[in-house]
From Swiss-Prot:
Keywords, alphabetical: Isoprene biosynthesis, Manganese, Metal-binding, NADP, Oxidoreductase
Gene this chain is encoded by: dxr
Cofactor names: Mg(2+); Mn(2+)
Organism the protein comes from: Campylobacter jejuni subsp. doylei (strain ATCC BAA-1458 / RM4099 / 269.97)
Name the UniProt record assigns to this protein: 1-deoxy-D-xylulose 5-phosphate reductoisomerase
Catalytic activity: 2-C-methyl-D-erythritol 4-phosphate + NADP(+) = 1-deoxy-D-xylulose 5-phosphate + NADPH + H(+)
Length: 356
């Protein structure tokens, strides 16, 4: 396996699972956490290593260290392994997804932004989704016909129990306290704004070619997806909240290894499902427009990244994240995109506009 984003939450869990099944790791790539990378190198002995910045190269305990995006693509080209786990955060992961598709590799995809911004250019890629909701949908949809609607669930994020009027005052520390999942900073903020759920609905559309979908809040994160059929029946996928299950589905050939303790239905508390309030989560208002016009993805994602990182760096407030997205959409509208180069152009233009 080739693992990009090895020192993040997904990468660390993927390596635990790889060790469980003795899966060889041929390449590791990370951003700036060189200390953890060196531990991983010592444990897994990869053939290739890549880091973000050349200034840290002398710190890496490996003979073959590649640098930046060019280095990632060189590794993909040179490495014979057929499986890439792409856990790079954000738009930065797109070029690696595109290169892996070009090379015909299987892509265990934690980088949902690749599909959000460029799904129409990734048709035919061999994706293995690393998202609890999309793994759940895969199981629910297998061999099924006459589907009426798909649902994925959201926990509600760190501020599910907050009143709308209190969201003006929340801090970064508050926003990073996810009630159910242990994840990286960016996706935890996206969970709090509901941008993550918006992205997952678009991801589901690109993976399963089905637009009749919605999301509901299920605060315990025990139900991950539901499938409604035309005859009125429905099925649901239950599991405890742990990303190792989704990762194992992508990287293990057989699903015969105990990963989590099963849900004990006799002890399970009452489940409640709630509609997502677009007053509290204004970003989710974009769902229908986004499904109708997937090219909005590059604008929404770029603006979201600017807004989230401004918030994480204490340059703006939590509610400014949504305002950032709506400001960019007001300016750019729905772009006409006919080439992958234009995706990169609109990403750049959106970030420049919001920084000006």
């Amino acid at each position: 396996m080739i693992l990009f984003g090895s020192t993040g939450s997904i990468g660390v869990n993927a390596l635990k699972l790889a060790a469980l099944k003795n899966i060889p790791i041929s390449a590791l790539a990370c951003g700036d956490n060189i200390a953890l990378l060196n531990e991983q190198i010592a444990r897994f002995k990869p053939q290739f290593v890549a880091i973000k910045d050349s200034k840290n190269k002398h710190l890496v305990k490996h003979d073959r260290v590649f640098i930046g995006q060019e280095g990632l693509e060189q590794i993909l080209t040179e490495c014979q392994d057929r499986l890439l786990l792409n856990a790079i955060v954000g738009f930065a992961g797109l070029k690696s997804t595109l290169k892996a598709k070009e090379l015909g590799k299987n892509i265990a995809l934690a980088n949902k932004e690749s599909l959000v911004v460029a799904g129409s250019f990734l048709k035919g890629a061999k994706f293995l989704p690393i998202d609890s909701e999309h793994v759940a949908l895969k199981f629910l949809l297998e061999g099924k016909k006459n589907i009426a609607k798909l649902y994925i669930t959201a926990s509600g994020g760190a501020f599910y129990k907050y009143k709308i009027k209190d969201l003006n005052q929340v801090s970064v520390k508050d926003a990073l306290k996810h009630p159910n999942w242990n994840m990286g900073a960016k996706i935890t903020i996206d969970s709090a704004t509901m941008a993550n759920k918006l992205f997952e609905i678009i991801e589901a559309y690109h993976l399963y070619d089905f637009k009749e979908s919605d999301a509901l809040i299920e605060p315990r994160s025990l139900v991950h997806a539901m499938c409604e059929f035309k005859n009125g029946a429905s099925t649901a996928y239950f599991s405890k909240a742990d990303m190792k299950l989704a990762i194992s589905d992508a990287i293990f050939e057989k699903q015969d290894t105990p990963i989590l303790e099963a849900v004990d239905f006799s002890k399970m508390p009452a489940l409640k499902f709630h509609k997502i309030s677009t007053k509290k989560y204004p970003i989710f208002k974009l769902k229908n427009a986004f499904l109708k016009e997937p090219n909005l993805g590059v604008i929404i994602n770029a603006a979201n990244e600017v807004g989230v990182y401004n918030f994480l760096e204490n340059k703006s407030g939590f509610l400014d994240i949504a305002q950032c997205i709506f400001k960019a959409l007001d300016h750019f509208g729905a772009p006409k995109i006919s080439s992958i180069e234009e995706v990169f152009e609109y990403d750049f233009k959106t970030r420049e506009y919001l920084r000006s």
